[in-house]
């Protein structure tokens, strides 16, 4: 039976959801205790880790962040959980910095849009290689109800949202529910986002501040544009798995059968 999309309460872990229960093709649903999405595990406390293992059967911690993020805020280890690092990021942002004497507004005109970054993460080879590794692990090692995978980036919004959307779209989760899951990240950071926006309006005009807001908020059009790109380029997410990621039709079919009930 399909269930309501909501964040799971933890002491320190935020923006965390089990994809289980989302309705899929053929009247089926994604199996619970299979995939969890979350924000950074940097501030994870022991009780959170125990809950992940006990209640959600988490066996793999899949970290999507770049090396620079890891060095500043490494994941807190969870006993019995295997850590994997697969960097999902297009290189264009890794060394992007504000130039000397440059205003924030001017810097914003040089930055790629978040929508473009989403497309890069499903088209550039470094990100495709990360996705091959991630979904290879999902296909081979994840066991619903026994060995679940938790995947996360810093906020559980963009990179995490892309991985979640690829799972959801592959198995036929309705688009409106995919977007509901994606947009729920804004609830987790609502107070911070409002504070950020007020701060940027002090140093930027409204147009620049609105543009900057795309960097720290989930926006439906960014995910929709990415999914539309996959449809146009590969005929959909299943075609993307076969043509861009290199999985066979039988591997994709077996994966879908494994994670649905």
Show which residues each predicted segment covers.
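Cys-dependent protein tyrosine phosphatase-like superfamily
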Residues: 1-150, 163-261
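Ser/Thr-glycine-rich phosphate-binding loops at phosphate-binding pockets of nucleotides
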Residues: 155, 159-160
């Amino acid at each position: 039976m399909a269930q309501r999309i909501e964040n799971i309460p933890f002491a320190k872990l935020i923006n965390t959801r089990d994809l289980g229960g989302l309705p899929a093709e053929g009247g089926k649903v994604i199996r619970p205790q299979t995939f969890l999405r979350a924000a950074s595990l940097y501030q994870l406390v022991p009780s959170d880790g125990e809950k992940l293992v006990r209640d959600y059967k988490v066996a793999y911690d899949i970290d999507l962040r770049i090396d620079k993020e890891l060095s500043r805020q490494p994941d807190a280890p969870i006993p019995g959980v295997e850590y994997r690092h697969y960097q999902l990021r297009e290189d264009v942002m890794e060394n992007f910095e504000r130039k000397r004497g440059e205003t924030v507004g001017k810097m914003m005109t040089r930055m790629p849009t978040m929508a473009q970054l989403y497309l890069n993460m499903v088209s550039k080879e470094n990100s495709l290689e990360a996705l091959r590794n991630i979904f290879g692990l999902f296909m081979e090692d994840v066991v619903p109800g026994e060995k679940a995978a938790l995947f996360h980036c810093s906020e559980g919004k963009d990179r995490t949202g892309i991985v979640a959307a690829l799972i959801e779209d592959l198995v036929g989760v309705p688009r409106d529910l995919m977007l509901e899951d994606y947009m729920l990240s804004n609830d987790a950071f609502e107070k911070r986002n409002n504070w950020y926006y007020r701060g940027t309006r002090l140093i930027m005009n409204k147009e620049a501040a609105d543009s900057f807001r795309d960097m720290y908020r989930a926006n439906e059009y960014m995910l929709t544009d990415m999914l539309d790109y996959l449809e146009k380029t590969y005929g959909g997410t299943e075609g993307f798995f076969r043509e861009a990621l290199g999985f066979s039709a039988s591997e994709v079919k077996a994966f879908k059968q494994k994670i649905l009930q």
